[in-house]
Every structure is written in C-alpha cells, then in structure tokens.
C-alpha cells in the first residue's frame, strides 16, 4: 500500500513509492571483486523539504543467508523536477561521490539513472561511472546497478529484490483505521 504523507513536499509525490524502509537480498558480481549473495537494507525518508534522504547498507551473506561482513554503504539525496527528471547526489563508503541524473518513466514507477559526475578519493578503487534502474513491482522495490572502470566496460554488478519493512507502528495505524463494524469472522470488504 502506498500512502502519501501529509507533510511530504508536493514535488516529491511522484517518488512516494520509494518512501519507507526496505530489506531484501541480491547478487554482487564484478570482475576483480568477490562474487556473492548480499543482504540489503534501504531507507528513503523525508523531512518536508524538496528531497528524499537515501541510505543503503549491504553485507555479504553466507550459504545459509547469515551476515558475514559489510559489503557497501551509500548515503544520498534524491530530487525530482516538474518534468520528471530525477537528480541524485550520493556518497559511498569506498571514497566515491557521484551525481546521477535520470528520469521517472511515464505511467509506471520506474527510474533510470546514469552518472553525470564522479569524484574519487586516492584510496578508492578505479571507477568511471554507472547506470541504475529502480522499479516498484507488485509492492516490491527492485533495482539493478551497472558500473564501469578503466579496465571493464559498463556491465551489471549488483541487483536486489527488496520488500517493504512493516513496523509495529504501521500495523497499529492500519488497525486504528479499520471500521468499527467489522464482522465477527474478521473478513471485510472495502469499497
């Protein structure tokens, strides 16, 4: 269920499908790096201003799905203009700072992004740019990331399937919104 918070900046309504906490798993595979399954937690929040704040933490999973060690972390800010153009500024824990531009698709919750600028610290690994695709499919958030380095052409390196995290506060809020005249069997149909 997608809810539009009353204090959400009006410009962000097209991105409302991103809001909330997400968790799931994916695959990481890039030449010269460890191939692994990973877990991920993502958060998109807002404070009433004209951007979403984004945080992502990933970790390597063992064969039983247990956390082994951190993989990557990102923090950024997402904006959208009246023409559905999306702008993202992002800082990664590996010493890379990126500016991404893209577009929200017409008639579907899908965002295509491509890097416009990349800045790297001396300690970071070689990286020259990337692409990302985010999509909201059947109430889940899915994404795929591509990257390139001076030695490797643009190719997919990470993808994940995330589920919305439901908190006890969400359940309580939804329960309070139920009608008082619920049938005894607990089944109700809403118009």
From Swiss-Prot:
It holds the Pfam family THAP4_heme-bd. InterPro entries: Calycin, Nb(III)_bact/plant, Nitrobindin, THAP4-like_heme-bd. A motif (GXWXGXG) lies at residues 20-26. Gene3D superfamilies: 2.40.128.20. Belongs to the nitrobindin family. This is Ferric nitrobindin-like protein.
């Amino acid at each position: 269920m997608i809810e539009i918070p009353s204090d959400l900046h009006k410009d962000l309504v097209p991105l409302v499908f991103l809001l909330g906490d997400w968790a799931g798993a994916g695959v990481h595979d890039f030449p010269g790096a460890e191939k692994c399954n990973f877990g991920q937690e993502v958060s998109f929040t807002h404070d009433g201003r004209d951007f979403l704040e984004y945080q992502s933490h990933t970790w390597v999973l063992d064969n039983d799905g247990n956390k082994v060690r951190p993989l990557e972390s990102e923090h950024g800010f997402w904006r959208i203009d009246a023409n559905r153009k999306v702008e993202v500024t992002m800082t990664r824990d590996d010493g890379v700072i990126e500016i991404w531009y893209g577009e929200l698709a017409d008639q579907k919750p899908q965002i295509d992004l491509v890097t416009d600028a990349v800045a790297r610290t001396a300690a970071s690994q070689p990286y020259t740019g990337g692409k990302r695709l985010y999509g909201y499919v059947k109430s889940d958030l899915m994404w795929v990331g591509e990257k390139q380095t001076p030695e490797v052409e643009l190719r997919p390196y990470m993808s994940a399937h995330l589920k919305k995290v439901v908190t006890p506060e969400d359940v309580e809020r939804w329960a309070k919104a139920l009608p008082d005249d619920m049938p005894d069997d607990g089944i109700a149909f809403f118009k």
